[in-house]
C-alpha cells in the first residue's frame, strides 16, 4: 500500500529507506525528501503514526489510543499544528509540580533518581511524578535525568494541549507526497559499506528493498525483541546500548457514557497512587467520553487481568475518584501497547548506568545505518520524535 506518490518500483534502489512511519520516521523522510533525496518509508502497520494513534471509529469524538498531548507553548510540535490548521484546547493545570533542584554536585553514574533526590533532601511528595507515565524513580538513571534537563522540565510550570479533532491531523504535513509502503514488516536488515537490503513481509508476499542508507526509527521494545535481525550484527557499542535501555508498559481504557459523569469544572482527575489511574474527559457532549490511563507497574497489573476485568477495574477506580455511582458505559475500547507486536511496549526509560546509551545508539554505523527516534533521545514525546527525525537526517546529509 502506498501513501502519496509511488516514485519507483520495488526493484529499484533508493538513496535512503526509512523503517517506521511514526513521527520520527515521517519527519526524517520529510527532511530527506525536501533536500532532493529519493526516499521510501516502510511501515509494518496498516496506518501511519506509530504510537500516535487516533481512533476515529469508536465514539462520537476522535480518541487518542497513544500519544495525546502537546507539552508547553514552546514545543516544536506547534509547527505541525499550524501547518495542519488544527485547533487545540488547553488541558489540565499548568502549575509547577516538582521542586526545582538546588545546585548540587551531579549524580553518580550508577545512581538511581530516587536515591539522588533523597540524598539532596527533597521530600518525596515534591519529586517529579514520572511514574504517572512511566516507571518509578528508583528505576531511572539520575545522571541521565540530570544531564537531559528532565528534572528542570518537571519543575517548570507548563500547559498541556490536545487536538480535539484528532492528534493525527499533524501527520498530514509530514506525510504529504512521501512514498510510504504500509503493511510492510521488515524482518532482516542486510547491511554493508555498499548499502542495505531489507527483507520485508508485505501483503503481496516477501520482497526486498534496496537503498544506499537506512534510517531506523523502531521502538525500543521491537529493537530489543530481535524481531528485526541485523546482518551482520550491530557493532558492540550499539548492541550494548540496546541491552542497557528498557521500556515500560502503558494502557488506555476508553469509555463512552450516555450522560456526563465528570465534574463540570474538571478536565482531568489526577493520579491516584492506590489505583494507578489518571482520568481524562474528552467530550462534554452527550455522550461523554472518558479515558482511564495507567503506566508502568500499574499497567502491568492490569494487563495480567482479562480484558473484562481491566474495564471493571477502571470503572471502579473512576467511581472512587468521583465518589459517586456511575452508569455502565454504552461503549468501550482499549489498546495494549505491550501486546502490540509493532511496539512491544509503550515508552522508553533510561535505567541507572545507561545514561550514555541513547547517544551511543544515535552514532551512525559506518555511514549506512542511522538510528533515530525515542531510543536515541530518551524523550517520550511527539516533539522529541519530530526533532529527532530532523536532527538525525541533518547528520546523515552532512555525511554525504
Regions found by a protein language model. Give the residues of each.
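FAD-dinucleotide binding site
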Residues: 1-400
Amino acid at each position: 500500500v502506498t501513501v502519496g506518490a509511488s516514485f519507483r518500483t520495488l526493484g529499484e534502489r533508493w538513496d535512503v529507506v526509512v523503517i517506521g512511519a511514526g513521527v520520527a520516521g515521517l519527519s526524517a523522510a520529510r527532511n530527506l525528501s525536501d533536500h532532493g533525496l529519493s526516499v521510501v518509508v516502510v511501515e509494518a502497520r496498516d496506518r501511519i503514526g506509530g504510537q500516535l494513534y487516533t481512533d476515529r471509529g469508536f465514539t462520537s469524538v476522535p480518541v487518542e489510543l497513544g500519544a495525546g498531548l502537546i507539552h508547553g507553548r514552546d514545543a516544536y510540535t506547534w509547527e505541525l499544528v499550524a501547518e495542519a490548521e488544527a485547533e487545540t484546547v488547553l488541558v489540565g493545570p499548568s502549575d509547577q509540580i516538582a521542586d526545582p533542584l538546588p545546585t548540587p554536585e551531579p549524580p553518580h553514574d550508577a545512581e538511581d533518581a530516587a536515591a539522588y533526590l533523597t540524598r539532596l533532601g527533597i521530600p518525596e511528595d515534591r519529586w517529579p511524578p514520572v511514574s504517572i507515565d512511566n516507571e518509578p524513580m528508583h528505576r531511572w538513571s539520575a545522571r541521565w535525568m540530570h544531564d537531559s534537563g528532565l528534572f528542570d522540565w518537571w519543575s517548570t510550570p507548563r500547559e498541556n494541549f490536545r487536538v480535539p479533532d484528532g492528534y493525527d491531523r499533524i501527520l498530514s504535513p509530514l506525510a504529504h507526497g512521501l512514498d510510504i509502503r504500509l503493511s510492510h514488516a521488515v524482518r532482516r536488515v542486510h547491511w554493508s559499506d555498499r548499502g542495505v537490503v531489507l527483507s520485508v513481509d508485505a501483503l503481496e508476499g516477501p520482497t526486498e528493498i534496496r537503498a544506499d542508507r537506512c534510517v531506523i526509527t523502531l521502538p525500543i521494545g521491537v529493537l530489543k525483541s530481535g524481531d528485526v535481525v541485523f546482518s551482520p550484527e550491530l557493532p558492540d557499542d550499539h548492541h550494548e546500548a540496546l541491552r542497557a535501555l528498557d521500556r515500560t508498559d502503558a494502557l488506555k481504557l476508553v469509555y463512552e457514557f450516555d450522560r456526563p459523569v465528570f465534574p463540570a469544572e474538571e478536565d482531568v482527575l489526577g493520579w491516584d497512587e492506590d489505583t494507578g489511574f489518571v482520568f481524562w474527559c474528552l467530550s462534554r457532549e452527550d455522550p461523554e467520553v472518558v479515558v482511564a490511563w495507567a503506566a508502568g507497574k500499574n499497567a502491568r497489573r492490569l494487563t495480567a487481568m482479562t480484558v473484562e476485568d481491566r474495564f471493571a477495574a477502571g470503572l471502579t477506580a473512576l467511581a472512587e475518584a468521583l465518589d459517586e455511582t456511575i452508569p455502565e458505559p454504552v461503549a468501550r475500547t482499549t489498546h495494549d501497547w505491550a501486546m502490540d507486536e509493532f511496539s512491544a511496549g509503550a515508552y522508553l526509560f533510561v535505567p541507572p548506568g545507561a545514561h550514555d546509551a541513547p547517544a551511543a545508539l544515535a552514532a551512525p554505523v559506518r555511514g549506512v545505518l542511522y538510528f533515530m527516534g525515542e531510543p536515541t533521545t530518551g524523550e517520550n514525546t511527539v516533539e522529541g520524535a519530530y526533532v529527532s527525525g530532523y536532527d538525525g537526517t541533518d547528520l546523515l546529509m552532512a555525511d554525504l
